Amino acid sequence: TDADWHPSGYAELFHVLWRASAARIPLSDADAELVEPLTAWLVQEGRRLSALELLGGLAAARAFERRTIADFSAFDAVLTPALAQPPQPIGSYAGHSPERTFAMQVEYAPYSSFVNVAGLPAVTIPVTTDAEGHPVSVQLVGRPGGEATLLEVAAQLEARRGPLPHPPAWDA
C-alpha cells in the first residue's frame, strides 16, 4: 500500500535546522580554512540565522514530525530507497560551491534526513548489488518505539534475499 505522504516545506526546515546545528561548532573565522568549505559555509550561514528563523524552523520540524507520524501510523513499516542516487565516486562534490555541495548531498540522501527529523526508528538493508558491485539498499521506517518490528522485518528481508555477492574489488 502506498502512503499518502507529501513532505511539503521539509527542505526549507531541514536547511534551517542543519545551518543552526552547524552554528554551534566552535569555529573561529581564523580557523575556517582548517575545515571543509561546506562546513565553514554551514557555520557561517547558521550564525546568520535570526531567532525568528530558528524558531520558525523548530516549529516547522515539530509540525512535520507530528504529520509524518500520523501519516505513517497505519503501517507497521514504511519502505523507502536508502539513497536517491547510485553511489557517487570519491571527489564528486569537489569543485562545487559549498551551497551547491550541500544541495547535492541533500538530493543524494533525502530519506534518512526526514526520518531523523521525524524521530522515527529506521534500518537500512542491502537488498542487491549494482553492476559495479555496490550495494543497493532499502530503508524501513517504523512507528515510534517500533524498533523490534523493524528488526523482525529486516531479518525476514535478509533471509529472503540470501547472501550478497562480494564486490569485484575484493578479488583484486
Regions found by a protein language model. Give the residues of each.
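Short helix-loop capping/hinge segments that flank enzyme active sites or metal/cofactor-binding pockets
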Residues: V16-I69, P81, Q85, T124-V127, ...
